[in-house]
Amino acid sequence: MISTPEPLHAGHILTPFCCGVDSIDNWLKQRAMKNQTTGASRTFVCCGSDSNVLAYYSLASSAVTTNTSPGRFRRNMPDPIPVVVLGRLAVDKSLHGQGVARALVRDAGLRVIQVAETIGIRGMLVHALSDEAREFYQRVGFVPSPMDPMMLMVTLGDLVESV
């Protein structure tokens, strides 16, 4: 059984987490709590019954220039365009292939939609670390940047339609 995403806190057990990508595992174990404390990003975790983290994602505010954005994304927007960055998203190897990553993207999308009621946001942006990750994000509705195929974006309107 896996919990619904909740904000990372000191009671969560991070050490056993292993998604298969060292840099993503290490970010959770070494940076996530520091970023949570300083406000640099917010991390949301799903745990097993023992508080071991089994999946996570992080969100941060940012902006993207219009020339790096797909046409629909930049239409009628200022330069730079306000966005939320889906900074990290990972699932423990024990849960790969069970739809957890897709559920995390949905949860992140719902949070972004909620925040957009208070502050201006055009959508969500992600930097894919691999071709496999890029293909996943495209399957869940993200569109690649015309300048960098590993930077993908989804508009707020598309998020609303997909969640």
From Swiss-Prot:
CDD domains: NAT_SF
Biophysicochemical property: pH dependence: Optimum pH is 6.5-7.5.
EC number: 2.3.1.-
Active site: 137
Catalyzed reaction equations: glycyl-tRNA(Gly) + acetyl-CoA = N-acetylglycyl-tRNA(Gly) + CoA + H(+); L-isoleucyl-tRNA(Ile) + acetyl-CoA = N-acetyl-L-isoleucyl-tRNA(Ile) + CoA + H(+); L-leucyl-tRNA(Leu) + acetyl-CoA = N-acetyl-L-leucyl-tRNA(Leu) + CoA + H(+)
Annotated Pfam families: Acetyltransf_7
GO MF entries: acyltransferase activity, transferring groups other than amino-acyl groups; tRNA binding
Keywords assigned: Acyltransferase, Repressor, RNA-binding, Toxin-antitoxin system, Transcription, Transcription regulation, Transferase, Translation regulation, tRNA-binding
An example Gene Ontology biological process: regulation of translation
InterPro entries: Acyl_CoA_acyltransferase, GNAT_dom
Function: Toxic component of a type II toxin-antitoxin (TA) system. Acetylates tRNA and inhibits translation. Acetylates mainly Gly and Ile/Leu in vitro. Overexpression during the lag phase of a tacA2-tacT2 deletion strain leads to a 100-fold increase in persister cells in the presence of cefotaxime and a non-growth state in the absence of antibiotic. This protein, which has a single amino acid compared to S.typhimurium strain 14028s (Lys-29 is Glu in 14028s), produces 100-fold more persister cells, has much higher acetylation activity and binds tRNA much better.
Assembly and binders: Homodimer. Forms a complex with cognate antitoxin TacA2.
Similarity comment text for this entry: Belongs to the acetyltransferase family. GNAT subfamily.
Protein name: tRNA-acetylating toxin 2
Organism: Salmonella enteritidis
